[in-house]
Amino acid sequence: MTDIHAQRILILDFGSQYTQLIARRVREIGVYCEIRAFDMTAEELAEFAPKGIILSGGPESVTAAQTPRAPQAVFEAGIPVLGICYGMQTMAEQLGGKVIAGEKHEFGYARVEKAEPNALLDGIVDHEEQGKEFLDVWMSHGDRVGEMPAGFVATATTGSCPIAGMANDEKRFYGIQFHPEVTHTLQGGRLLERFIRELCECEALWTPSNIISDAIDTIREQVGTDEVILGLSGGVDSSVVAALLHKAIGDQLTCVFVDNGLLRHQEGDQVMEMFADNMGVKVIRVDAEDNFLGKLAGEADPEKKRKIIGNTFIDIFDDEASKLQNANWLAQGTIYPDVIESAASKTGKAHVIKSHHNVGGLPEDMKLKLVEPLRELFKDEVRKIGLELGLPYDMVYRHPFPGPGLGVRILGEVKKEYADTLRLADHIFIEELRAAGLYHKTSQAFAVFLPVKSVGVVGDARRYEYVVALRAVETIDFMTARWAHLPYDFLELVSSRIINEIPGISRVTYDISSKPPATIEWE
């Protein structure tokens, strides 16, 4: 069996907003990687045994005291190192060069001129003019390298940043001031592939079929002959987990589909048809609407709502597991960004933005052990795994749906009346997006219930009824997103249908906030 983790890249995180994007680009090249904090110890580094190391960007200034530095072991390991933006600057400083505060900051598109030949950039070019080669790149920096360490040559330059790239081919140390991980750097993919496949000499072992084979072996070794219980929601992550576990352990898997009253339109019937009827998976359907709504009654705080929903799910799983003779494991659809975002990152000094349903709301006294076969994967990788396992395209590429469901799309207190109203509004919005061919042109779209009343007119009568907001965004990575510029006539159609077909709604609004500063979900 191929060890798909053997040839791997280590990404040391200095707090960049793009760090996860670096990891996704490495995975796309077919090589496993992990993100670790910048202050990894020499022992941890040796144990991880990477084939190469990438130093991420970051918001700090190398010129300030007490700012993050890479472990010295990084430069003593005898393996290739690529420093990106801040990573290049700390590499230069730590190896004897100098970093200075730039007189002119560079943010956004830039054209860099290639300079000295080197193994990283040779043959990679966007434009040639008068015998010179140029790259179109994305910059985001204030400081710059003013003096390179001994043994380095300048590989790229701009008018305001004379050393926009540097290289020491003998030691295989490379620094670039721009960001190859973002799509605005047109040759970024080629550059990263050059570093990983050629300079680090990594094979492309991280493929969907290999990941599935490895996951099956790991699952079988982990759970043995025990039974596994999985909370099946119908979302992408839990659906892929169900298909993967069913392939690995067959009837040892029992899925519990909890109808909590906070699901999408007809979602329960669709889940049962797909998994129980078509795939032969054992699925127990639990009607728990009254249970959930009872516990949520009177609670308006979003974080508390998430915790209530998470804990209630676990209580139900525990109860169902107690009915199964051998059930010792709870399977979850936790994915890699869940793990990263739910950790209080010391590199970015980040607050936990939201407690993820999968990893942030589990009680300490939970009786079941966890099995999380997607924990190493990004969302795009999960989708590829789903297709490889034979799940339908429309299910695999369905828009994301939060674990707490409509509970975090109803602002404030959750009531059955609100959930029923929102479910119908959301259904109309999604139905019309599909009919107009716009569903897959948006990354995520949904309706939000606002617990405020607005005046409306029906016939000659005034009425005060609720407001629904529509939200649709376009994004590549869900870390940043822009609001989707849907046609006005389309929005008019959706608004008209919602107001005319759903009792209790008098007004429909469209959310035109981007992320940041807003988040995609309202709670």
UniProtKB/Swiss-Prot annotation:
Highest rank taxon of the organism: Bacteria
A GO molecular-function annotation: ATP binding
Pathway: Purine metabolism; GMP biosynthesis; GMP from XMP (L-Gln route): step 1/1
Residues annotated for ATP binding in this entry: S233, G234, G235, V236, D237, S238, S239
Cellular component terms per the entry's GO annotation: cytosol
The protein's Enzyme Commission number: 6.3.5.2
Domain GMPS ATP-PPase: 206-398
Annotated active site: C85 (nucleophile), H179, E181
InterPro entries: Class_I_gatase-like, GATASE, GMP_synth_C, GMP_synth_GATase, GMP_synthase, GMPS_ATP_PPase_dom, NAD/GMP_synthase, Rossmann-like_a/b/a_fold
Transmembrane segments: none
A Pfam short name: GATase
Keywords: ATP-binding, Glutamine amidotransferase, GMP biosynthesis, Ligase, Nucleotide-binding, Purine biosynthesis
Ranges where the Glutamine amidotransferase type-1 domain occurs: 8-205
Catalytic reaction equation(s): XMP + L-glutamine + ATP + H2O = GMP + L-glutamate + AMP + diphosphate + 2 H(+)
PANTHER family: GMP SYNTHASE [GLUTAMINE-HYDROLYZING], GMP SYNTHASE-RELATED
Assembly and binders: Homodimer.
Entry function: Catalyzes the synthesis of GMP from XMP.
The protein, known as: GMP synthase [glutamine-hydrolyzing]
Taxonomic path: Bacteria, Pseudomonadati, Pseudomonadota, Gammaproteobacteria, Oceanospirillales
Gene from which the chain derives: guaA
